[in-house]
């Protein structure tokens, strides 16, 4: 259902450069509809509004979708509430997106057999030309990933 929502959100835009923040806001609203009643989790978006190609927007949205879904499902077991943050940072050649939670931390996310994380790793490495980092401990999990900015989205190029 989430992948269909991502596709619907992205195809509502034209073929040109896509600002990521509005897409992620719509994705956030989908999460609140999907998980809001079951999980009283505060989902926050912050940082730079990156403009990327439609393809990059789709890939970033898929990765964020998977990471936020994992956080909703696994980070807050045995807890009444929590917080998930999605932080965007724009760099000169690379941009980064970090999905972090203040949950219980998990080694599951590093598990080689975790299909969702394999999808994240492959999408970031192969499609976004970037790298995924995983940090997990008793204060939560942080999964930053970086990616090469598609220069064709800049004006004048």
Language model feature labels by segment:
Residues 81-93:
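Short beta-strand/loop element within the Bergerat-fold HATPase_c
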Residues 18, 36-66, 72-83, 111:
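Conserved short strand/loop->alpha-helix "switch" segment adjacent to the catalytic nucleotide/phosphoryl-transfer site
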Residues 101:
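Acidic ATP/Mg2+-coordinating residue in the GHKL
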Residues 108-135:
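ATP phosphate-binding glycine-rich loop and adjacent ATP-lid/helix-beta elements
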């Amino acid at each position: 259902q989430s992948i269909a929502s991502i596709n619907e959100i992205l195809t509502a835009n034209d073929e040109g450069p896509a600002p990521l923040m509005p897409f992620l806001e719509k994705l956030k609203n989908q999460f609140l509809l999907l998980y809001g009643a079951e999980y009283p989790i505060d989902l926050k978006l912050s940082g730079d509004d990156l403009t990327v190609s439609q393809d990059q927007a789709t890939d970033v949205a898929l990765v964020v979708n998977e990471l936020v879904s994992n956080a909703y499902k696994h980070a807050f077991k045995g807890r009444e509430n929590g917080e998930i943050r999605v932080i965007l940072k724009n760099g000169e050649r690379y941009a980064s997106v970090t999905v972090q939670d203040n949950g219980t931390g998990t080694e599951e996310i590093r598990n080689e057999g975790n299909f969702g994380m394999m999808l994240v790793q492959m999408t970031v490495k192969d499609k976004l030309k970037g790298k995924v980092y995983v940090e997990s401990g008793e204060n939560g999990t942080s999964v930053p990933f970086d990616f090469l900015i598609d220069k064709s989205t800049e004006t004048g190029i």
